[in-house]
């Protein structure tokens, strides 16, 4: 659910319902494109980019594929004409664990051989560059492989990682 539209990920596409009508995925007319019409937009990348997760971040929607991250943006309102998807970073992710936000950052898992790392995605305040720092660099063997769930608490400044493997 994003900006009063119900959305789905379908391979490389993001599909949104009509504005305010969550179960309508067909345009009102075929001769004109209305601002309230459904949206069906694809990511464009040199690698195969099957979308795995979508997470709200700041005023946009972050889209996660196996080897790249994208940002879905729209000026003012989300319409078929104003929607754009741009590549922000290119990190390999753990596909089973949905990224979580805490404060001004977004966290996601990355495979590291027999272990898993956690990246902290944020937009740099002065340069507006997108980057993801490895917040587990000081303990690279702490989280075992098989990450399937991330949970966050901004009150406790904590990220919880659940894995299928034992430590």
Predicted features by range, described:
Residues 6:
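Short conserved active-site loop signatures built around small residues
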Residues 22-38:
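Acidic/polar low-complexity surface segments
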Residues 13, 19-20, 42-167:
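Beta-sheet-dominated scaffold domains
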């Amino acid at each position: 659910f994003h900006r009063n539209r119900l959305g789905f990920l379908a391979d490389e596409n993001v599909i949104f319902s009509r504005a305010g009508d969550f179960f309508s995925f067909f345009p009102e007319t075929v001769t004109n494109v209305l601002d309230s019409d459904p949206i069906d937009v694809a990511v464009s990348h040199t690698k195969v980019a099957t979308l795995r997760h979508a997470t709200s971040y700041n005023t946009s929607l972050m889209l996660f594929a196996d080897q790249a991250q994208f940002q879905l943006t729209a000026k003012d309102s989300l319409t078929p004409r104003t929607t754009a998807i741009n590549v922000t970073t290119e990190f390999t992710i753990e596909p089973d664990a949905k990224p979580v936000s805490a404060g001004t950052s977004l966290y996601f898992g990355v495979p590291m051989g027999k272990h898993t790392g956690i990246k902290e995605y944020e937009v740099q305040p002065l340069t507006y560059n997108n980057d993801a720092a490895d917040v587990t660099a000081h303990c690279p063997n702490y989280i075992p492989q098989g990450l399937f769930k991330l949970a966050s608490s901004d009150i406790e400044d904590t990220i919880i990682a659940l894995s299928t493997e034992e430590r």
